[in-house]
Amino acid sequence: MKQKFDIITSTCVPLPIENVDTDQIIPARFLKATTREEKFFGDNLFRDWRYNADGTVVEDFVLNDPTYSGCILVAGKNFGSGSSREHAAWAIAGYGFRVVISSFFADIHKNNELNNFVLPVQVSEDFLKELFDSIRQDPKTEVEVDLPRQTVTNKTTGRSEHFDINGYKKHCLMNGLDDIDFLVQNENKTKEWEHGTEVY
């Protein structure tokens, strides 16, 4: 069982780049690991943007900039396109992000994030631009993500937007359940349904 998701208020890490694909999130050479080793994948999130070929740090990349921190990643439009590798969601979760905000997500990556207890919050392009502007002007800008109410709020401007989420996934996040946990939790109901179903 994972940590339950309710309301998160945090400063943000801005990544105002569109069309970030899964190979940029976690390069293919790290896909040999087939178990979810969160620290390994988190350490290599955006590896080729964070480090030069010789392993030295790219000082001006946002994850290396101490100005920005928090458990919310604010990303440009069309986040998570490309191959369907679940490792990309592992890397995001492993780094410590609990929320990713963008104006559009690739469907498969969006589902992979949900399956790994990262909440993808899709907002309008206008709201996303406002977030980037607020964070740029004040890196201590906080954003509140309220899963029960399905709202995201820029605490600096007070502006909020509603976001959509599958009802089942919302239930799982709020109760810290993955698919197996959910089935185990509802095992008795499943058995009752099976016993009550006639076979023709």
Where do the PLM segments sit?
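Cytosolic catalytic domains that perform sulfur/thiol-centered chemistry
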Residues: 1-200
